[in-house]
Amino acid sequence: MPSRSSLLLALLAAALLGGCTGLVAGPEVAATTPVPASRDSALARARRGLTTESFTMDIVDPSHGHLTGTRYPSSNAQLGTSGRCRVVLSMDVAGDASASTVSTSTRWVAPEQMADKAPEVCDQERRDVLDRLNLVLAPPPAQ
């Protein structure tokens, strides 16, 4: 059975694609990140990371540890560049007072005119955004 975050991400992507003609979307990609912090701290880190990455939050449900958001493209980005890619994300935070797990489901959405470049350009942008979010969730040890 699909997870709640997968269903919400699919509905959000469908709304984006159905409400806006001329868009293409990449596949949904799921990932899990262990966080060496309490569930509440992991949720705060997730929100901070999403704010830093300029995500517009669509759903914020802290009682269930669920966040859904979209990072919209830059208004002045050139067609064919990563700045024209949307990143759609759904995050579920689970854990206890000592450790947490953040399950993330992401996909890219791009203008139809980028259909030839989007699988490479936008997927790289999606991966880069997720890498930066993971650094906020579980920072490397201080040297």
Label the predicted regions.
Residues 21-143:
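Ser/Thr-rich, low-complexity intrinsically disordered terminal regions
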